[in-house]
Each structure stands twice: as C-alpha cells, then as structure tokens.
Amino acid sequence: PERAIAYSNKKVVSDEIVDAFTIGEARSFEADPRFGFIVLAEIASRALSPSVNDHGTAINTISSITRLMLLWHNPKSETETENSQSDSAQHEEFKYDRISLPALNVNDLFDDAYTSIARDGAANIEVAIRIQKSLKTIKACFKDGGTSIERDFVEAASKLAKQSYERAKLALDYEDDIKRIERVYNDN
C-alpha cells in the first residue's frame, strides 16, 4: 500500500499513469496466472472432501491443470521461433523497453496447482495415479527444452511427483494400491 507502482521522469498527467493499472480487491485470471491454478486446486480439494466425495471431479481438474501447464510448452520450428523472436524482440524493444515484471516462480505455480490435491487425495489411488501421470506428461513435454523455464518445469514436476508419491504411500492402506503407485512413480 505504501509503495509506488509506477514512476515517471517526464511530466505526465497522473490520470494516464493511473489508467494503465488495474487495482482491485479481488484477483483475476487475466492478471494472475497462478490464481487460476489456485481455483482449480480448490475445486479438486473440495471434491475430495468427505462431504462431497467426488473423485471424478478431482481427476478431471487434474487433467485441466495438465492442459494449462502444457500451454507454456509451444513447440515451433526453428524458423518460426527465430522469426517470432526477432519480430517480438524488435516490437518489444520499441514499445515496452521500460516495463519490468517479476519472473514467474515455477515452484510456486506447481505448489498452487498440485500440493493441496496431493494432500487431500493421497488416500485415493485413482487421484494419486492421475497426479503422477499429469506430472509425467509435463516432464516429458519439457524435458528437451533448452530454456530455463522449461528446466524449471521439469524440476518442479519431479519434486511434486516425489512428494505426491510419498504422501500416497503413507496414506494408502491396501498393499496392492501401494505397489501400483510405486510402479507409476518409478515409471517416471
């Protein structure tokens, strides 16, 4: 509240600066990509609660999270990538050279998306397996990427897969279920 969100070394009408920002009491999906993952995780966690007991909704939500995570992976041909990078770099150089944003913390993103579901669904073999498959898909799609964000996605997915596996192993009672989740985890 007490920190400025914009500075200008030119005489600019303050209304122009104020109009460039949206300030509100509620987060929005457009302004905060993590917010969408938090909402999806809350839907899944609520579906896993004893009062609702709807594992199908949790599984569908995990599938939605997977598809959204994969939007960060957009394979293009080298020519397309080079052309789009030079076009966008040139465009950004002139239009947005004074804007800076904090980098997206991939570990926080994965934590928002998976941790509560892994915790609340640890005792359900179907949910535990779906989480493992989701994270395996993400790792497979990002594993050959050369960018730091792709490496961060693989690292975060590996970390969450291990945590989810360990939670499930502690929560599951039936020996065959424990063996199933172990096989799926080790297949990663």
Regions found by a protein language model. Give the residues of each.
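Membrane-embedded segments
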Residues: 1-3
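Short basic (Lys/Arg) and small-residue
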Residues: 5, 9-188
